[in-house]
Amino acid sequence: MDERGIKMGWAIGGICKPMVELLQKGKVGKVIDVQDFDLDAVNSINQTPGHFEMSASQYANPANKGAFVNKLDFVVLAALEIDTDFNVNVLTGSDGVLRGAPGGHPDTAAGSKCCIIVTPLIRGRMATVCEKVVTVTTPGDCVDVLVTDYGIAVNPRRPDLIECLDKAGIPHVSIESLKEKAYSIVGRPDEVQFEDQVVAVLEARDGTLLDVVRKIKPYTFDD
């Protein structure tokens, strides 16, 4: 940002110290947050001009046409898993067990002009880039770019971004090749076995059914 004189107009989301520091250094014009992740962010709301609080409805309510997520140019998000259709899972682990909550992940992905997922290719012995995610939290039609430590992949639905990367000389590969690279390192995982019982339902932003989480079957070892 210093080298190219880049300044962000504003930033939203869960805020922590690094974003507060960017605001205080003049690299970000305004910070509007719906939750804080550390005390530096909490204190900044009271002490730093240009740091504002907003409600969850102002942040990402699908029925609110003025929601801030709909005004984002870019959003950078993480993932537990991402598959070759660019579907993202941030809810369940590779073992099918609930790990947390989606938060604003699907909202910011859908509302922004460009959604960038940043994640390592593998975690330990698990492939982050895979054939099919355990649970769809954010659908692939809302995800534009995947950035890993082994390469960048662009959703084929965004030929405009592919053209931009080509013009900038930024190399990129297919997401299928990243999946195969991950499997070549850690192996292809066995599918998680589930029972019929549904323990959680995932709704899309429009209220339609996106996916379900089922009770996992107890793991058994082969004799």
Task: Give the predicted meaning of each segment.
Residues 27-223:
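Conserved phosphate- and dinucleotide-binding cores of soluble alpha/beta proteins
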